[in-house]
């Protein structure tokens, strides 16, 4: 099972945080970009503030535009083979993340359900949430912890999110710290955004941040609008989780129960989808859904509003766009809207040191090679992750790709139709020259997107919750103020807010 801060998703490792100053240096090789730096965060902050005005980072020079070479045949197929969940076992014990990913990547076909295992089948809706969290792996961060130490804790534990508590002796939580907050903080230090909170304390923290002084993670976690921190007791079921997460909420806390608000785990969209996959053979009622193409579920419709970033645009532009739109990843496309790759908010870790400042002015296309190289160095993976699906990809295979790539969303592409090859004088097709080519030649033209919210929303509607709205949480975040970051909410309050939202539409 993946580490989900006790259910918070696993993230790649990276050196300690140091907000970089923009540099005029040309992009280095991916290996050089990942070299360690001795520059401290305090020393770097002051440099980051200087010369970082937005006007300096609007568009890259043509010499910076370098699309990484496409992977060879076989490298791009790591997730194409992902089709079948792990085999049925009577035990509900948790499997390791590495074993699960390997199983997902190597399963060649989606096998039929075996009625000899009927005694092990169960309704997915009835599984309790305490089966899905690991209290012994839960890691907190105190609100007064300096942000750089909180970032180190994210890295050390391979998490993408940490619950924030007011004091070590407290186990109740009202909000979290994640890579989206880190991105907002980097942009704040560099002067691209301002804090919504204008209280004297907040303004003092902004001043400290821009002068290179430590600021508490509690302040950084409040820089952007978030979902109210929903708390659900441990004896609640997976049906409740799908209702919450299928409405667009990214994660919620699992607590001891009505008599105690002590948090025992954080359940995210990614962990929930992984759990569905790992136990898929036990949920026989999901077999028809797993086999259904995305287009039949309404998940692959052409969407002209998919958020993208041009391959020739700066990395800093991608970070700003993800922050402004409150999304966790962007599709990188060429001038013809062909999919080149994917940039995630977690990739902000690769520009968190002063030695990496040149990457802020690198093109997004070049940055894709840096991301790929980091994946290879950290995980030993020499393959290009497949972040795309087609309208005919099945629901089950889409889930499998999300599990294999740890992606929050997959891009829907219209595959390229190969043109007929001219024949040689002998009547045989001409041999194909194998050389570097753009990723678009393999990925196809971008037409839409499928997110974890979409996957869980379909699951909820499949279970009979026809009113489940995948856009509820996004609307709620847009209406929220910075004070909502620290608000707690019970499941009952969540249901009431949904009813109010329906009445306003």
Swiss-Prot record:
UniProt keywords, alphabetically: CBS domain, Cytoplasm, Nucleus, Repeat
Entry-linked InterPro entries: AMPK_gamma/SDS23_families (IPR050511), CBS_dom (IPR000644), CBS_dom_sf (IPR046342), Ssd23 (IPR016711)
Gene Ontology CC: one annotated term: nucleus
Stored Pfam families: CBS
Residue span(s) of domain CBS: 132-195, 225-282, 302-360, 382-468
GO molecular-function terms, A-Z: protein serine/threonine phosphatase inhibitor activity
Keyword RNA-binding among UniProt keywords: no
Compositional bias annotation for Low complexity: 15-40, 481-490
Disordered: annotated segments: 1-70, 85-104, 414-441, 464-505
Comp. bias (Basic and acidic residues): 493-505
GO BP term, pick one: cellular response to glucose starvation
Source superkingdom: Eukaryota
Cellular compartments annotated: Cytoplasm; Nucleus
Job description of the protein: Involved in DNA replication and cell separation.
PANTHER family linked to this entry: AMP-ACTIVATED PROTEIN KINASE, GAMMA REGULATORY SUBUNIT (PTHR13780), CBS DOMAIN-CONTAINING PROTEIN (PTHR13780:SF36)
Family according to the record: Belongs to the SDS23 family.
Name of the protein: Protein SDS23
Species whose genome carries this gene: Yarrowia lipolytica (strain CLIB 122 / E 150) (Yeast)
């Amino acid at each position: 099972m993946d580490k989900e801060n006790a259910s918070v998703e696993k993230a790649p490792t990276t050196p300690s945080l140091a907000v970089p100053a923009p540099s005029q240096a040309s992009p280095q090789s991916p290996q050089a970009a990942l070299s360690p730096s001795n520059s401290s965060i305090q020393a770097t902050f002051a440099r980051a503030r200087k010369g970082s005005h937005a006007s300096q980072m609007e568009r890259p020079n043509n010499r910076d535009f370098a699309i990484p070479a496409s992977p060879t045949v076989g490298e791009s197929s790591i997730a194409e083979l992902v089709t079948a969940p792990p085999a049925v076992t009577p035990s509900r014990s948790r499997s390791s993340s590495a074993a699960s990913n390997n199983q997902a990547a190597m399963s060649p076909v989606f096998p039929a359900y075996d009625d000899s295992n009927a005694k092990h089948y169960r309704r997915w809706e009835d599984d309790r949430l305490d089966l899905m969290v690991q209290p012994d792996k839960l890691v907190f961060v105190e609100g007064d912890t300096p942000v750089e130490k909180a970032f180190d804790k994210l890295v050390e534990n391979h998490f993408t999110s940490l619950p924030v508590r007011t004091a070590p002796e407290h186990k109740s939580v009202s909000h979290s710290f994640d890579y989206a907050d880190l991105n907002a903080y980097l942009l704040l230090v560099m002067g691209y955004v301002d804090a919504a909170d204008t209280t004297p304390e907040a303004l003092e923290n902004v001043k400290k941040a821009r002068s290179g002084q430590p600021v508490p993670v509690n302040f950084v976690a409040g820089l952007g609008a978030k979902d109210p921190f929903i708390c659900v007791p441990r004896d609640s079921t997976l049906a409740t989780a799908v209702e919450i997460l299928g409405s667009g909420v990214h994660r919620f806390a699992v607590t001891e129960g009505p008599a105690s608000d002590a948090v025992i785990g954080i359940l995210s969209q990614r962990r929930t989808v992984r759990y569905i996959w790992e136990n898929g053979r036990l949920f026989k009622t999901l077999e028809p859904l797993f086999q259904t193409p995305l287009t039949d579920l309404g998940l692959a419709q052409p969407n002209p509003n998919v958020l993208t970033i041009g391959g020739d645009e700066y990395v800093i532009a991608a970070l700003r766009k993800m922050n402004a739109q409150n999304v966790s990843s962007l599709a990188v496309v060429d001038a013809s809207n062909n999919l080149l790759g994917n940039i995630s908010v977690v990739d902000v870790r690769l520009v968190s040191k002063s030695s990496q400042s040149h990457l802020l002015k690198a093109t997004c296309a070049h940055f894709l090679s840096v991301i790929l190289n980091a994946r290879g160095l950290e995980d030993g993976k020499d393959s290009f992750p497949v972040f795309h699906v087609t309208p005919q990809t099945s629901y089950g295979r889409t889930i499998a790709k999300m599990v294999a790539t740890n992606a929050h969303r997959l891009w829907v592409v219209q595959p390229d139709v190969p043109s007929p090859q001219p024949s040689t004088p002998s009547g045989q097709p001409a041999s194909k020259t194998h050389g570097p080519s753009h990723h678009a030649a393999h990925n196809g033209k971008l037409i839409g997107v499928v997110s974890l919210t979409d996957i869980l929303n379909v699951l909820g509607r499949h279970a009979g919750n026809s009113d489940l709205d995948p856009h509820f949480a996004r609307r709620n975040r847009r209406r929220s103020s910075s004070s909502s970051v620290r608000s707690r909410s019970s499941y009952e309050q969540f249901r009431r807010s949904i009813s109010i939202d329906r009445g306003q539409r």
